[in-house]
Amino acid sequence: MTQLASSYDPSSFESRLYAQWESAGHFKPSGSGEPYTVLLPPPNVTGTLHMGHAFQQTLMDALVRYHRMRGYDTLWQVGTDHAGIATEMVVSRNLALEGKGETRDTLGREGFIAKVWEWKAQSGDTIERQMRRLGTSSDWSRSTFTMDPQPSAAVTEAFVRWYEQGLIYRGQRLVNWDPVLKTAISDLEVENVEEDGFLWSIRYPLADGVTYEHVEHDADGVETLRETRDYLVVATTRPETMLGDTAVMVHPDDARYATLHAAQIVLPLTGRLVPVITDDYVDRAFGTGVVKVTPAHDFNDYQVGVRHDLPLINLFTVTAAINDNAPERYRGLDRYDARKLVLSELEDLGLLVETKPHKLQVPRGDRTGQVIEPYLTDQWFVKMDALAKRGLELVESGQVKFVPPNWINTYRHWMENIQDWCISRQLWWGHRIPAWFDEAGKCYVGHDEAQVRATHGLGAEVALHQDSDVLETWFSSQLWPFSTLGWPDAQAMDERGFARYLPSSVLVTGFDIIFFWVARMIMATDSFTGQVPFRDVYITGLIRDAQGQKMSKSKGNVLDPLDIIDGISIEDLVAKRTSGLMQPRMAEKIEKATRKEFPDGIIAHGADALRFTIAALATHGRDIKFDLGRAEGYKNFCNKLWNATRFALMNTEGAQFSGVPQPQTETERWILARLDAVAAEAQAHYANYRFDLLAQTLYEFAWNAFCDWFVELAKPALNGAVQDAADSTRHTLLYVLEALLRLLHPLTPFVTEELWQQVAPRLGITGDTISLQAFPQRGDVDTSGYAGAEADIEWLKAMVSALRRVRSELNVPPSKQVRLWLQAGSSDDRARVARFASQLAFLLKLEAIDWLAAGQEAPPAAAAIVGELTLLVPLEGLVDMDAERTRLDKEIKRVENEIGKCNGKLGNATFVQNAPAAVVEQERARLNDWTTQLTGLREQRAKL
């Protein structure tokens, strides 16, 4: 075996270790033990690894590695989504860059799809390569692409079944329409952006000479205007859509318009008559209390139109130009050119009352940036009512559990307000809808054209053409939990372990897709298999930058996880952040901010430091602020672990141990007891998905208990003359280190594997990899008699800390020996001083330890207090008196602050009444200890 390198350099071993794991098949299911399955939310095949992926995949990998070490039969199902819209855009852009004049339209459907498959073969595995760099222990041999033959067959089967059950239908409804992509898109693909716009107030003339008494009042209720009007005033932010108005509505209880409920309006610019209707939807307090109704171009108006059976007039073409349903002079105009003409004509007619600035929430497509139109079109839909009712029952009955549980409320709200789901998209890349039409427009649904013809007795003379639309990607994604396990093919289901691995154990995902994906998987899995897709849904927060801002290309604040792992120069980072911007004018601002934040670029941290950072940040909150400084700190943590291992190896050279150590010293018993407790805490944190508490527990044990204290406290025994104690301490040093590496492995797999390969042989442990070793359990070591050791070592630590603080504040050189006088103290203190005298002398460079006799005057000395014991370091020849006075004043102030904190808690009636009695009593004991210390410090100060 090669010798451990002298310094921690993750780039020297991370890729090598991953290749070894994968080639050895360590990530494949074992086939034995209780199954533990995790579903990877399939990233877009077009995508690259971003911080959101890295965040969730780190937590998933930790869960998988942890359960693999506990003997579970682990399956981490991975794969990629075909990402219809995104993929078409990427391939279209690449065609343009090639400069051959080829476009989507010139190639035609078959030619374009062939180009997509070519691109997928060349670039489609980018994100999976990046996932390997992060350390994800997925079974890559089972990686699934949503357009593979088997999942494609599952999509067809699901569509046909739901159609035959009457759950899928074709109809005309309002959808989100992207006029650039010329397709419907989902709500998740729409970003509502606050922008400056205008609110126009327009006169709508009443028909048939109808008038009403219009009255206005000021804020105090005083009448300011009374006049007879033959028009209503309507406010709108989209005047061009008035050409498609089919009603004007008022609130039924609005007295101002009570006489107009049966009236009609002459719609300006068109001359059409539209009714005045009443509806509770109207907010009487907003504007004039009169609202135009355009059912074909507003989602709320559409619902009003359905309730009142209003006509739906679609004004737009697929590119958002005005169509033939508008007066002839508007036809063919872009929607915004039509707006200008409408406003101009209204002004000429004296119907434009007012124009004022107004803040708008503008819906824009997340890929094109174009304003999205509510658009009336023929689409395929899934009836959701019955599916949603059952999906809600499965969660509320506890068959699917949300963590944290408050997300059930969000789930319930969505499920109780669900609308039918538009599943068709006007694209070429994707699962084509298995529906065929004859020349009369009659629709036939089946698995393929041959089956359709056979089922319906259609001969070759009957011309059929398949629906040109494809299914939106969420349709195939909802089948992910069971389509990846071979459904609906019985042989594939058997081969891929359908009965064994469904339901999966946990889904780790973000709250933003609870409805779009989580809910749909619950409904679909129940509908098609009669099971739930997963037992737990762990909802993570969303990764934001250190200031809490959303990471986005347009803001220039995106952090690439691979740049954190491998490092990147400032020039490359600037180039990455400023290229391909939708708003190129932002490049200069982004470059300036980037150079300010990362003047020297980003150093390489390694995958383990990034992973541990992610775990430490994984609270149960809604947002996660990612601070690169934390990654630097955890790189130092990995380095500390590396150096502690080198210390252990140097001090056990040639040694060979086996089994559980039989401790000879209190120090060993203390660290073994701490190890036992930490193993139990770690398992509890995994069970509760508290990765933040897990990271904190392991960090404190590794850095503080093991690296700082045990290694230090073990040195006297390691260097002492008592051979049994030295050998036992060496055994314990290796034993605890090896267990610590196993505790840390799910979070930091690379460094722990590299170190374990060096440590394990000295303990007689066989095996190729730490990843298949048992995770530490409470009870691995019988620590039932170690309580006294824990108390003793906590006392010893307090003594060492107090004396080191004194030495530091007095600037006593580390090599200089000092004398220690002890005063007061309990019988336990005296016994412990006698028992640990050699360790105290070794660790603190003490030339002597003496007790002051009762009534003996203490020399001028620097003082520290540990419980009832006063520690005195004589100052003669050590420091000047002024410096010691300053030190004591600082220490007195520190203790006074602690007393203030205790008094604040104990003076808080809520704390005293509601906190557990043991906690309150502990606070009182702390107050007593601090008060005793303060008394002693003041006495020492008085002597100076």
UniProtKB/Swiss-Prot annotation:
This is Valine--tRNA ligase. The lineage of its organism: Bacteria, Pseudomonadati, Pseudomonadota, Gammaproteobacteria, Lysobacterales. The gene is valS. Its main location: cytoplasm. Residues 878-944 form a coiled coil. Belongs to the class-I aminoacyl-tRNA synthetase family. ValS type 1 subfamily. A motif ('KMSKS' region) lies at residues 550-554. Catalyzes the attachment of valine to tRNA(Val). As ValRS can inadvertently accommodate and process structurally similar amino acids such as threonine, to avoid such errors, it has a 'posttransfer' editing activity that hydrolyzes mischarged Thr-tRNA(Val) in a tRNA-dependent manner. Pfam families: Anticodon_1, tRNA-synt_1, Val_tRNA-synt_C. It comes from Xanthomonas campestris pv. campestris (strain ATCC 33913 / DSM 3586 / NCPPB 528 / LMG 568 / P 25). It comes from the Bacteria. NCBIfam families: PRK05729.1, valS.
